[in-house]
């Protein structure tokens, strides 16, 4: 079966094969729920619905899935044990770990990311709660579509010389464009930066751990505030990983806490993190309001609120992630005289958020992840080149 690319006038004649999704979960309820959601989508199909990790390992070569949704807790062979075996048999398999929100499962999910899983998704405690099930559905389908789509685009590019009649490429994210050389870049702000703000989503944990390990001199002298799209418990674990990577203090922001240099503050899962000025000091204000850009915590609330505190002294970085969160806040930062750096497409797991910022023309630089850290060190040391 092939499906025409929808919503893109430039590619109305292009077709692609639906993403093949393998569901691996010992819960028949979860398998049935995910199967129904996937089968209702025009750009994906259920390649297999399996009960154990052992079933998945034994059948993955025959099934040939593009994406696997892999439960952590299963009989015979659990998700974390099955993960490396699946990747050994199919190196390009996109694996999304699924687990309930416990500390143990959060820790296992982080281990899975280090072993090659592409992403994770928290399963609702009960699928009977409509709002929780709707959020799970929205997030899961988005992850399958965007993560699977990137692999298809890479495969399509690698085989483009063969000029196949049937394109194996799903609709690209809205901001995944052609040559980055064509992106309009603006000069860095003239004011020396006094705070570092970072926003990230899919692929963010690994990117953040890599980045903070390279900017110790920045953290020592300036506050660093981060919003990563993540649920509660997961952000607690991420803060611990950031502290180990940076070898500097890192923790979830606390409502009313004074922001100080030498600290990394991470937005806690399920709450927006803003900054306000009180008595001449920058103070964290946690917000339990509705999601922004479908996310909570979201990047835009952090970016926007920081302007009232640091004005033109803001340097913001938008890392890998789906959607466009951070773009509007980045626009306001630039309008106030600050600067924005975006991660480039090649080094991003998903070039949604950084792509939105780059294509909006608000970035002073669009860089590979391994060049962002050294650039930040130079900028905070006064080198504006």
Curated annotation (Swiss-Prot):
Tagged with keyword Hydrolase: yes
Any one GO CC term of the record: cytoplasm
Residue ranges annotated for the Response regulatory domain, each copy included: 20-138
PTM remark: Phosphorylated by CheA. Phosphorylation of the N-terminal regulatory domain activates the methylesterase activity.
CDD domains per UniProt: CheB_Rec, REC_CheB-like
A molecular function (GO) term: protein-glutamate methylesterase activity
Modification 4-aspartylphosphate occurs at: 71
Swiss-Prot/TrEMBL catalytic activity: [protein]-L-glutamate 5-O-methyl ester + H2O = L-glutamyl-[protein] + methanol + H(+); L-glutaminyl-[protein] + H2O = L-glutamyl-[protein] + NH4(+)
Active site: 201, 229, 325
UniProt enzyme class: hydrolase
Gene Ontology biological process terms from the UniProt entry: chemotaxis
Domain (CheB-type methylesterase): residue spans on this chain: 189-383
Keywords of the record: Chemotaxis, Cytoplasm, Hydrolase, Phosphoprotein
Record EC number: 3.1.1.61, 3.5.1.44
Pfam families hit by this protein: CheB_methylest, Response_reg
Compartments reported by the entry: Cytoplasm
Function of the protein: Involved in chemotaxis. Part of a chemotaxis signal transduction system that modulates chemotaxis in response to various stimuli. Catalyzes the demethylation of specific methylglutamate residues introduced into the chemoreceptors (methyl-accepting chemotaxis proteins or MCP) by CheR. Also mediates the irreversible deamidation of specific glutamine residues to glutamic acid.
Description of its domains: Contains a C-terminal catalytic domain, and an N-terminal region which modulates catalytic activity.
Family: Belongs to the CheB family.
Name of the featured protein: Protein-glutamate methylesterase/protein-glutamine glutaminase
Organism: Rhodopseudomonas palustris (strain BisB5)
Gene from which the chain derives: cheB
